[in-house]
């Protein structure tokens, strides 16, 4: 009788250890997936960056600004140059 109780308790303890290990592995997998999503999003943002400055972006000359923008001489930021062409 005592050995059956001991085996049952040992089995429950073993089951608890296996389940907690599985849960830890699941949490680690979830962390890896979230990290991968964040890294992918960061890479996508970097891929969309352009070599020119957008409206009100800092600049030192007209060549720094994107198309249809020019560098404002006093404030050193990109402003619209007044053109509409595509």
Curated annotation (Swiss-Prot):
Signal sequence region: 1-20
Naturally occurring in which organism (per UniProt): Cyriopagopus schmidti (Chinese bird spider)
Disulphide-bridged cysteine pairs: 52-66, 59-71, 65-78
Gene Ontology MF terms in the entry: calcium channel regulator activity; ion channel inhibitor activity; toxin activity
Pfam family, one: Toxin_12
Disruption phenotype: Its natural mutant mHwTx-V shows no effect on locusts, cockroaches, and mice.
Residue ranges listed under propeptide: 21-50
Family recorded in the similarity comment: Belongs to the neurotoxin 10 (Hwtx-1) family. 17 (Hntx-9) subfamily.
Function: Omega-theraphotoxin-Hs2a blocks voltage-gated calcium channels (Cav) in adult cockroach DUM neurons. Reversibly paralyzes locusts and cockroaches, and causes death at high doses,.
A GO-annotated cellular component: extracellular region
Keywords: Calcium channel impairing toxin, Disulfide bond, Ion channel impairing toxin, Knottin, Neurotoxin, Secreted, Signal, Toxin, Voltage-gated calcium channel impairing toxin
Protein's UniProt name: Omega-theraphotoxin-Hs2a
Note, other: Negative results: has no effect on voltage-gated sodium or potassium channels in DUM neurons. Has no effect on mice by intraabdominal or intracerebroventricular injection.
Written domain comment of the UniProt record: The presence of a 'disulfide through disulfide knot' structurally defines this protein as a knottin.
